């Protein structure tokens, strides 16, 4: 598969065209961003770790019949993916209260939620990725049919159950995570983007040590060392 011109560059990845119009290559970057890119950094090797972790988790989901854009990992930093049209919604799934949820609702940090919470955020950096509901999605023209929103919610909950059980076996708590979905050439809604410590909050079950991008957000030390530990555990 030939890697051709760059189609898009985001905060954590670059997308490249290939000799197949329906397939792209995602190249994972070493860049670190937080607070809507107000805080920026870089750590060598971070992109390769995210690529490897995402590949393991996409393959896990495939074994549970979850449709994703993932085809295969090409090398340490490149992933072959189906080309999709991204739905501009960040689907956030929360199992434990932390971050913005505690500030917004006054819930104690680290509290286990009585039920899984699924939230939608409008993907727009200029607006600060605001929290939105089903009606907002329709008014904005992001989603036209309620059935499509129900697919996003249902898929998010299924993915949560699979990942939560998997990470639990590896001694990790899946606190919360962000998903992005897209539509393939046939119009099917499938999981896209990545699943990594950049997009998931992962805490050690015994110590509650943070092994995710909060290490960068909160100046807790090396991101790479934490991501290496996550990769080590999920490969066991």
Curated annotation (Swiss-Prot):
SUPFAM superfamilies reported in the protein's UniProt record: SAICAR synthase-like (SSF56104)
EC numbers: 6.3.2.6
Enzyme class at the top of the EC tree: ligase
Top-level taxonomic group: Bacteria
Signal peptide, first to last residue: none
Keywords in alphabetical order: ATP-binding, Ligase, Nucleotide-binding, Purine biosynthesis
A GO BP entry: 'de novo' IMP biosynthetic process
Substrates-to-products reaction catalysed: 5-amino-1-(5-phospho-D-ribosyl)imidazole-4-carboxylate + L-aspartate + ATP = (2S)-2-[5-amino-1-(5-phospho-beta-D-ribosyl)imidazole-4-carboxamido]succinate + ADP + phosphate + 2 H(+)
InterPro entries per record: SAICAR_synt/ADE2_N, SAICAR_synt_PurC, SAICAR_synth, SAICAR_synthetase, SAICAR_synthetase_CS
Gene3D superfamilies xref list: ATP-grasp fold, B domain, Phosphorylase Kinase, domain 1
Cross-referenced Pfam families: SAICAR_synt (PF01259)
MF term (GO), any: phosphoribosylaminoimidazolesuccinocarboxamide synthase activity
Keyword Nucleotide-binding tagged: yes
Pathway assigned to this chain's UniProt record: Purine metabolism; IMP biosynthesis via de novo pathway; 5-amino-1-(5-phospho-D-ribosyl)imidazole-4-carboxamide from 5-amino-1-(5-phospho-D-ribosyl)imidazole-4-carboxylate: step 1/2
PANTHER family associated with the record: MULTIFUNCTIONAL PROTEIN ADE2, SI:DKEY-6E2.2
Record-linked HAMAP family: SAICAR_synth
Family according to the record: Belongs to the SAICAR synthetase family.
Protein's name in the database: Phosphoribosylaminoimidazole-succinocarboxamide synthase
Biological source species: Helicobacter hepaticus (strain ATCC 51449 / 3B1)
Gene that encodes the chain: purC
